[in-house]
Amino acid sequence: NSLITDKMTVDQLARDCYLPGNKILQELIEAQQGKFKIVFSISGTAIELLQSHRPDVLLSFQRLAETGCVEFMSETYFNSLSWLHSRSEFKRQVVLHQNKVGEVFNQRPAVFRNSELIYCNELAHFIAGMGFRGILCEGLDTILKGRTSNHTYAAPGNGDFGVLLRNTRLSDDLAFRFDDTS
């Protein structure tokens, strides 16, 4: 049964990741007196799962949001690749996600991230037209060509619309080697 599987997965993530991680982040924000900033991207379906199965986890994210040191990015509601297939469906999902973030976290996202961090200049222009101030995309070495991902770039023809590149090396260290003590 998929409901049982969803609950088991969410329970495991809550126990092993979300609750201990959010506790550490809350402590860091308090210890740094608001100088420590965080950005999350949580799909609409993930928010729904938390609402259904682990409202305590959702509450921990809401408490983080209340610090004023946490922002939520927007994305497609279902973490879909709708940009590649239908602009109207893409826009519908982005608006749906913005509304969910507003309802749950009392924020209006200013930065967008596409599924799998897929980027093209046309997407940046489209997203800027929806009122976003920036987009997060993959910071691959083939794109950077020796430049740093720790800099905000501009999308061609979009003035002050920011393009943020994921620091792949640091992100991979955190995701795959965080607990490596060797």
Please give the residue ranges for each predicted region.
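Catalytic alpha-helical scaffold of carbohydrate-active enzymes acting on polysaccharides/glycoconjugates
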Residues: 1-110, 117-172, 178-182
